[in-house]
């Protein structure tokens, strides 16, 4: 079809709509008088008529099939950022616009009281420093039900030189600085300013998120521990001559929070060098076990007893996103979704459900590691980093929502890497997966108070992200050796 023919058709349609809008009142169509519907038709007709001018001015041939192909190609080849933003837009409408502006009260309902606050702020920091003070006084470190490794008392002992609220101010500054390092500086160094839009977007979402506010309110140090781990990973892969510093940093992180042990899997330079990898992990294991004796044998025994109590108990709260907490909630309340009979069946099989969920995580982890081994990859594997972070979130029995900011940097890295793929089916799958991952992540930015009941606990969202990352790794045939090789070329 020639553009000029299509233009005439469009012009005829537009003029017809305008004429109908003008004479509809005279022919008795609709309500008497010039109504809003007629004005709408009038505007639409004028729009079509004006648009037709462009087609009339062009005499080239218009092929619908070619046009559709161009549109679909443009959509499928859209930058990753577009699909990430689209997922965020959906969440923004569902969890902000609708509850704030479209509520039944017909008034602005500000999102307030969405953190289970404790007065005064910085309670966890004050509680932990009081334990350090107790240890220095000779009364023991674990008298106050603390569950941190012994080295924590050494690392954070300088806080005793300060008084509250100065301690809280200093910890807040450390956390914010750590967030800048882990969420902006290190990813920028790794990506060399590529996909900076996605990177900066995730940094902003992380620093303004509900989880970050929770972290600051409690005076927690998850972001600090994660930053030490991330810095260790970066040094190990990009400045290998300083690898011993990397071992020290990640060991300190483990001795502060324990769960950074998941990130030791990132300290692999050559997946097929079994001897070096075994020696490295063995050395790290021996070193970290020895650090548990830093305050003496008795403190070590107290720590072990504390861990046994912690691992044997499940603290069920909507903001405890651990696997154990989720299964307990699922099998006791049904998350407000399942009927009592179904809940009873779930409760009888709670151990099996736990096993299946842990097995599913391990399978996803094995797929990522297996592909890295098969491809003999080197460098920082962004997908593995994301999966390790999710493991650090869900495996510990006590895992509170103030750990959520840890997702921001790893998601930025995982979703910023997008190898070119011309296979249409894979492009469609990738597009859908990116939107789903973005949607799941963006839900974690809002408090459990404003999420749907069945998503109040973040665990299902983590499993969606885990599945999506694994799917991208396989479908997109992602290989991160290319990123590392590009880094070396840039350095030269």
Which sequence ranges carry the predicted segments?
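Transmembrane alpha-helices and membrane-interface helical segments
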Residues: 181, 185, 227-238, 266-271, ...
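Primarily membrane-embedded glycan-assembly and transfer machineries that use lipid-linked glycans
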Residues: 67-239, 243-245, 270-401, 480-481, ...
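Juxtamembrane interface helix immediately N-terminal to a transmembrane segment
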Residues: 1-17
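Juxtamembrane "helix-exit" motif on the non-cytosolic side of transmembrane helices
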Residues: 23-31, 373, 441-451
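Aromatic-enriched
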Residues: 103, 107, 413-492
